[in-house]
A protein has these predicted regions:
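Hydrophobic membrane-insertion alpha-helices, especially the h-region
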Residues: 9-25
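Alpha-helical transmembrane signal-anchor/signal-peptide segments
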Residues: 29-47
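Active-site-proximal structural scaffolding
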Residues: 13-17, 43, 183, 214
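Cytosolic-side transmembrane helix boundary signature
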Residues: 1-7
């Protein structure tokens, strides 16, 4: 008897969940397709001592991303000849407009060595959480030697009044806000990459020094293209 009641209760729960799901699908108000983007598709020409020049999208990105995807990119250099590559990728109409940067990197010759989340202190606003990737790829120097170039990359996603360093959180927020808040995020991701120059140039920077350099650059550049967090 207890077993029969338990089975009946489970069946009722399944039916209730199914009914609620169908009701949400049937009666949820369609989200506003014109929801604003969380970024402006522009990068500054100057960030402190850093001077930037426009750079085109990579061939891997052109192949993987739909033609309506917005991309802006600049390569920056400071007086000591350190360099930073900054990029904003803004989704178009198709869901595949955005993906994890980890998908494109192997096509550009990079190997991902580690991944974690770091905080970027910002003036007058909460710290930004970004995913950090430590990368390597073989490069040939002018003297003919082949060495392993190391690099530090920071990236994060920006939606309508929200940011996250995690791809799965972006996916969850997309579904949740679409159903509950009738909000259709037009997501973008921002990434900032710099080579780790220790051993490659005079006064080269190690991994932690490169991270600090990127933190300072982001703190100066972010207010020009992003309002949150």
């Amino acid at each position: 008897m207890d077993s029969s009641r338990s089975l009946l209760l489970r069946a009722l729960i399944v039916c209730a969940v199914f009914g609620v799901t169908m009701a949400l699908c049937r009666y949820t108000i369609p989200p506003d397709e014109a929801t604003r983007a969380g970024v402006r598709l522009v990068l500054p020409d100057q960030v402190g001592l850093w001077t930037g020049e426009d750079e085109p999208a990579s061939q891997a990105e052109k192949t993987l991303l739909p033609p309506d995807t917005g991309i802006v990119r600049k390569r920056y250099q400071d007086p000591s000849r350190q360099s930073i590559l900054a990029s904003i990728v803004l989704a178009g109409a198709e869901k595949r407009s955005l993906h994890r940067p980890e998908i494109c990197l192997p096509g550009q010759g990079w190997t991902i060595r580690s991944s974690d989340v770091v905080a970027i202190p910002l003036d007058g606003r909460p710290a930004l959480q970004a995913t950090r990737l430590l990368l390597t790829r073989p490069v040939r120097l002018t003297d003919g030697r082949e060495v392993s170039l190391r690099a530090c990359m920071l990236y994060w996603y920006v939606g309508d009044e929200v940011t996250t360093p995690k791809h799965w959180v972006r996916i969850w927020l997309t579904s949740w806000d679409r159903v509950v808040h009738h909000r259709n995020h037009r997501w973008a991701y921002v990434y900032i990459l710099a080579p780790i120059t220790e051993g490659l140039m005079p006064n080269g920077k190690n991994g932690e020094e490169t991270l600090d350099m990127l933190r300072g650059f982001i703190a100066g550049a972010l207010p020009t293209f992003q309002d949150v967090p």
